[in-house]
């Protein structure tokens, strides 16, 4: 993950959870303060579901307007948490229509599902027919599961805003992320969402941003930056965010590499010695001592997107044959049958010592 300045163009598709407190502008301002650029547009009619967006001319026209870097998809706040029967009949087919529209525009666009938060006291209107949503935690768990299902189903990413909220509430339940209706976000909730989106889109921490709304104090802003960023960056693979990552195990001149990348289609390994591989988890043996720069490149979205991780491998194998010096008192040298013979090269000999130990040696012509 590089820290270079980036420019991303993003379309936000959602409803009031996105437009209250102008979430896209909050993300834009955080990015600007950290040297990055977010260009954005929105289609966020109040209360819109995925089904409504799937037939909304404005939404579909904006999807096709240009080759976006990301298109954020936020469902109506309750619908992904409802019963499996409802979700399968209403949410998933509409999400498929939106994904199809995105892919019809360009396979290079990355869909980014907006995992929202559970209502403060659960979903009272759906509690009786579907008890899992009776509480905040129950509703949050259903939202988490369904948004991740959709992300993995469509090889898309997920911005885990709801899980950042859960983490914040666990740390300090007195910081009210909700507005007075216990559903929509307060400015604290929207700022936390913005920090989470910044980390999801740019794959960089929002910690250190000099921007926060004037109604938030600096200590609280810093805490929300930490929570949003760590929720994303500590678990990129969990949220299916495209990322190149590797680990390795070295034994002498042989190195076994393990690919830990997420949401990728293919990988290319450059071992730094002129050799490459497209294997998932290759093992490579170096012919000479030296320090090698190994680059793993992960590729996705019809080869439009690439990410890389670089590690340094040092090989230092001694090739010298050293004379073994025995401080012990030598009694005799024998062949392998125990017959005493004078010292010879190129054949195995047994060295018998006064302390009763026996060593097998062979000395080679240099």
State each model region's role.
Residues 240-250, 304-341:
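Residue-level detector of functionally pivotal "anchor" positions at catalytic/ligand-binding pockets or at interdomain
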């Amino acid at each position: 993950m590089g820290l270079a300045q980036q420019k991303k163009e993003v379309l936000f598709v959602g409803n009031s959870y996105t437009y209250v407190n102008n979430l896209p502008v909050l993300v834009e301002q955080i990015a600007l303060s950290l040297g990055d650029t977010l260009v954005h547009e929105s289609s966020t009619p109040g209360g819109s579901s995925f089904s409504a967006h799937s037939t909304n001319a404005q939404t579909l026209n904006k999807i096709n307007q240009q080759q976006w870097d990301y298109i954020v998809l936020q469902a109506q706040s309750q619908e992904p948490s409802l019963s499996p029967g409802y979700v399968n009949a209403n949410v998933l087919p509409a999400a498929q229509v939106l994904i199809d529209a995105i892919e019809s525009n360009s396979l290079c666009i990355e869909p980014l599902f907006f995992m929202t938060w559970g209502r403060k006291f659960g979903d009272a209107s759906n509690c009786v027919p579907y008890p899992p949503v009776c509480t905040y935690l129950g509703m949050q768990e259903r939202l988490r599961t369904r948004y991740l299902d959709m992300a993995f189903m469509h090889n898309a990413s997920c911005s885990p805003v709801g899980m950042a909220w859960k983490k914040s509430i666990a740390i300090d339940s007195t910081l009210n992320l909700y507005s007075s209706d216990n559903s929509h976000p307060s400015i604290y909730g929207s700022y936390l969402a913005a920090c989470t989106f910044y980390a999801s889109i740019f794959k960089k921490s929002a910690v250190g941003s000099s921007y926060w709304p004037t109604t938030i104090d600096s200590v609280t802003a810093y805490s929300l930056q930490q929570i949003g960023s760590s929720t994303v960056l500590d678990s990129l693979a969990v949220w299916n965010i495209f990322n190149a990552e590797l680990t390795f195990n070295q034994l002498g001149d042989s190195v076994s590499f393990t690919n830990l990348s997420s949401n990728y289609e293919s990988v290319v390994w450059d071992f730094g010695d002129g050799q490459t591989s497209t294997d998932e988890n290759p093992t490579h043996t170096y012919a000479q001592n030296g320090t090698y720069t190994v680059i793993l490149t992960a590729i996705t979205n019809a080869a439009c997107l690439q990410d890389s991780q670089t590690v340094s491998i040092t090989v230092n194998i001694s090739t010298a044959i050293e004379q073994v010096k025995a401080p012990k008192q030598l009694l005799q040298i024998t062949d392998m049958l125990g017959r005493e013979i004078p010292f010879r090269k190129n054949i195995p000999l047994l060295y018998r010592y006064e302390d009763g130990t026996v060593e097998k040696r062979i000395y080679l012509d240099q």
